[in-house]
Amino acid sequence: MVNLRKTHPLMKIINHSFIDLPAPSNISAWWNFGSLLGICLIIQILTGLFLAMHYTSDTYTAFSSVAHICRDVNYGWLIRNLHANGASMFFMCLFLHVGRGIYYGSYLYKETWNIGVILLLTVMATAFVGYVLPWGQMSFWGATVITNLLSAIPYIGTTLVEWIWGGFSVDKATLTRFFAFHFILPFIIAALAIVHLIFLHETGSNNPSGINPDADKIPFHPYYTIKDALGLLFLLLLLLSLALFSPDLLGDPDNFSPANPLNTPPHIKPEWYFLFAYAILRSIPNKLGGVLALLASIMILLIIPLLHTSNQRSMTFRPISQILYWILAANLLVLTWIGGQPVEQPFIIIGQLASILYFLLIILLMPLAGLFENYMLEPKW
């Protein structure tokens, strides 16, 4: 009898994607984050679905409905804590996944990389509209401040902001549409993730050495299924530890107060995973300039394949590029810290210097390091 998984129309697709898929024999734990992101998305969709059953997207009852979920719904507190902290896990895996791609030159699979950047932007949009839903102080003022940035667009800005708001301020219409967006976007993300995988399977996975691994491939199952299962175990350990022991560790205390348009919190700041971009936005003392820098901080990922100057794909054997890469990683941590600080000295100047260094490293220093390493390996003297 012919094996069903190799003949059945549906099973055949799953087989080619997750079972008999030829994978490089040397991919490290940095290659675990793709599968972990898939798990994160499933967790978020499931917990989100159960939250949506009890949530009401009305300005008068939204805050109360979230309190009701935590107090009265069976395991509602757990579902909410898993969903809120699941978002943090999602972004942690995302940043590590993108960081892996930059370090090992995975961005040279251009289609896969570009879909990945679109995925990152979509997840960021989903997280932003989701943060507004509990209708606490930081939800309301975060929505007001970030949507207001669009008013910096010349000529159409103000009209655009009022169109997104559905009125002249963030109100019931805004909350309702943000709930609708937050419900539909994860399914769009799931579809994009499938496209991401389709493009990846056109070329096969990259590996730490950066050289063609075709000469030494192993089946995905059981080797990488068991490896992914171990990664999942670590992810769940971290997520459950957060959700059960300190669920509010990464949240903002201001969000325990219901939204009040007449009372502005002293420090308006987004969740931790947006702080690096928020710091770049604030480092430019001009509204339009700040918005453009904010956009550029993410969109710069799209031009990274064009800035690859090295003869080697991966940074594994490129010490100068490695040093610059880890400076970039440290710089992003500094930006994250600055984004959570008030707008006063010395934080302003630190944020401005870190923002300049961020763009300088990606656009100039890392490509130059690649050229220098080429020269050192094949000197012309």
Curated annotation (Swiss-Prot):
GO MF: metal ion binding; ubiquinol-cytochrome-c reductase activity
Keywords: Electron transport, Heme, Iron, Membrane, Metal-binding, Mitochondrion, Mitochondrion inner membrane, Respiratory chain, Transmembrane, Transmembrane helix, Transport, Ubiquinone
Protein name: Cytochrome b
Binding-site residues for heme b b566, renumbered to this chain: H97, H196
Gene3D superfamilies referenced in this protein's UniProt entry, alphabetically: Cytochrome Bc1 Complex, Chain C (1.20.810.10)
Note: Heme 1 (or BL or b562) is low-potential and absorbs at about 562 nm, and heme 2 (or BH or b566) is high-potential and absorbs at about 566 nm.
Gene that encodes it: MT-CYB
Assembly notes: The cytochrome bc1 complex contains 11 subunits: 3 respiratory subunits (MT-CYB, CYC1 and UQCRFS1), 2 core proteins (UQCRC1 and UQCRC2) and 6 low-molecular weight proteins (UQCRH/QCR6, UQCRB/QCR7, UQCRQ/QCR8, UQCR10/QCR9, UQCR11/QCR10 and a cleavage product of UQCRFS1). This cytochrome bc1 complex then forms a dimer.
Subcellular location(s) of the protein: Mitochondrion inner membrane
GO biological process: mitochondrial electron transport, ubiquinol to cytochrome c
Cofactor note: Binds 2 heme b groups non-covalently.
Membrane topology, record value: Multi-pass membrane protein
Described function: Component of the ubiquinol-cytochrome c reductase complex (complex III or cytochrome b-c1 complex) that is part of the mitochondrial respiratory chain. The b-c1 complex mediates electron transfer from ubiquinol to cytochrome c. Contributes to the generation of a proton gradient across the mitochondrial membrane that is then used for ATP synthesis.
InterPro entries per UniProt: Cyt_b/b6_C, Cyt_b/b6_C_sf, Cyt_b/b6_N, Cytb/b6-like_sf, Cytochrome_b, Cytochrome_b_C_euk/bac, Cytochrome_b_N_euk/bac, Di-haem_cyt_TM
Regions that span the bilayer: 33-53, 77-98, 113-133, 178-198, 226-246, 288-308, 320-340, 347-367
Family, per entry: Belongs to the cytochrome b family.
